[in-house]
């Protein structure tokens, strides 16, 4: 969270506020309601977290509104996997603008490089 806080201050935001409740659909909708905002899940090897049905409708809304929705590599969400319904393999990212999305992807990139 410290790196996200630092990025927020660099982008001239007053800081961050975290929401630690709600499911994937609600968290994505809150991004639209609370600009500037983001909701993300970094990729992980474990089969857990949200499934495609948790993200499909909100991804459609974000695309129609021209708001950022992608995985951590800036690719479209993989909503038609044959091997699993889980979205853990590439992560998810919803952001109210490109600058926030780029910062979250940069933080993820740095974290995975240091492993």
What are these regions (language model features)?
Residues 1-115:
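An extended, acidic
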């Amino acid at each position: 969270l410290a790196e996200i806080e630092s990025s927020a201050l660099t982008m001239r935001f007053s800081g961050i506020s975290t929401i630690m409740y709600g499911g994937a659909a609600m968290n994505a909708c809150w991004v639209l309601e609370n600009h500037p905002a983001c909701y993300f899940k970094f990729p992980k090897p474990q089969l857990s977290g949200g499934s495609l049905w948790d993200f499909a409708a909100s991804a459609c809304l974000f695309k129609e509104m021209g708001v950022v929705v992608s995985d951590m590599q800036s690719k479209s969400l993989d909503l038609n996997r044959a091997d699993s319904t889980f979205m853990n393999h590439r992560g998810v990212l919803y952001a109210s603008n490109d600058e926030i999305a780029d910062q979250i992807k940069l933080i993820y990139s740095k974290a995975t490089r240091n492993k």
